[in-house]
């Protein structure tokens, strides 16, 4: 039997700070739900790691699974981990599953796990800082390159969320002259699991953009489209609902949101949105808008289609991998195309939208059972 170890450092830190789970965090929580009953928790900082006892692991997993923000309990877990850790223990068939990028740049992390007979398997979500550094904060490309290269050199296995991510990883490994470790592609399931119908949050046609406000998501472009819609159609223009926190390098978007008078009544910003409210926004949207320049996976795409909601998206390879020909695709800089499609989709009678609704019926929703089926079979191959 394989002994599973889960690094929960990022999850506990964010829970202690009262932060809502990100997409990466939700993956980590899914791994706890899958393996938590028999796994051990790991805490790490700058490559120094401790393995928690079974009792401390259960407590950590319970706090995370139930989103219990008990900072005192979290501090006790960390303190006990330093005293009661199994740092020098040797495990039979141990495998560390690390679902975030945090800490994968430290080679001593891999060495310490190897010293415990624990193989290291990391999930790679994207290589965007390397392939498109212009969309990231300064310096992120160097940090991410160190993470990826260290994993290529030392990891026993890698999990990617899409074939597109694996292809990018393979090209980067080839460019660096590094071998690609054993790997598996395992698609991620939508975070929204309930399909219960809820009442519409807005009595008007609207569209949703979902994701952190950052340059590669193309919010600035879409706000200009909306300004044109308002100029053309006035009060009858559809609404735009932006669900996501303000991120980095987005001052031009913030200027539009806060200072463009014509957008005041047409754009709604939801920076802290619960799963229930997000489901309501998506269920009744005319479409999800996904005009990104680049994505590693694109979870909102899968979430919208799983709810039966049409999608207007950039024509990205990873989107076609996840959704095939179901969405209506556009170039992320085709202003006239986006304007026309949004105006058409806003109408009560829209043949293009009706046709997509028919295509959605054949969408194959990724599930966690499928994901972990791929992962479990992969782990059995690691010797």
Regions found by a protein language model. Give the residues of each.
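Carbohydrate transferase catalytic cores enriched for Leloir-type hexosyltransferases
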Residues: 1-383
């Amino acid at each position: 039997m394989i002994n599973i170890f889960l690094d929960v450092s990022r999850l506990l830190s964010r829970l202690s700070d009262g932060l809502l789970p990100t997409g990466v965090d939700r993956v980590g929580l899914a791994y706890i739900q899958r393996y938590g009953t028999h796994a051990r928790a790991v805490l790490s900082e700058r490559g120094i790691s401790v393995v928690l006892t079974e009792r401390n692991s259960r407590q950590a997993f319970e706090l995370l699974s139930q989103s219990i923000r008990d900072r005192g309990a979290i501090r006790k877990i960390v303190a006990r981990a330093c005293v009661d850790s199994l740092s020098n223990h040797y495990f039979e068939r141990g495998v560390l599953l690390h679902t975030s990028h945090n800490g994968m740049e430290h080679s001593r992390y891999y060495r310490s796990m190897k010293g415990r007979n624990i193989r290291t398997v990391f999930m790679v979500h994207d290589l965007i800082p390397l392939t498109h550094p212009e969309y990231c904060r300064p310096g992120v490309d160097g940090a991410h390159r160190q993470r990826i290269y260290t994993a290529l050199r030392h990891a026993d296995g890698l999990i990617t969320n899409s074939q597109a991510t694996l292809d990018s990883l393979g090209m980067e490994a080839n460019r660096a002259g590094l071998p690609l470790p054993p790997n598996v592609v395992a698609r991620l399931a939508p975070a929204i699991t309930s399909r219960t119908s809820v009442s519409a949050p807005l009595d008007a046609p609207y569209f949703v953009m979902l994701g952190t406000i950052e340059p590669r998501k193309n919010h600035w472009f879409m706000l200009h489209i909306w300004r044109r819609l308002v100029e053309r159609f006035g009060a009858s223009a559809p609404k735009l609902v932006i669900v996501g926190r303000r991120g980095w390098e987005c001052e031009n978007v913030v200027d539009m949101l806060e200072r463009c008078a014509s957008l005041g009544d047409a754009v709604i910003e939801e920076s802290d949105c619960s799963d229930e409210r997000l489901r309501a926004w998506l269920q009744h949207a005319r479409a999800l808008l996904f005009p990104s320049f680049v994505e590693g996976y694109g979870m909102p795409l899968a979430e919208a289609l799983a709810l039966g909601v049409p999608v207007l998206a950039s024509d990205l390879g990873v989107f076609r991998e996840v959704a095939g020909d179901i969405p209506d695709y556009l170039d992320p800089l085709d202003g006239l195309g986006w304007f026309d499609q949004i105006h058409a989709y806003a109408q009560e009678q829209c043949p293009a939208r009706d046709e997509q609704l028919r295509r959605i019926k054949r969408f194959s929703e990724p599930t966690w059972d499928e994901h972990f089926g791929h992962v479990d079979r992969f782990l059995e191959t690691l010797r």
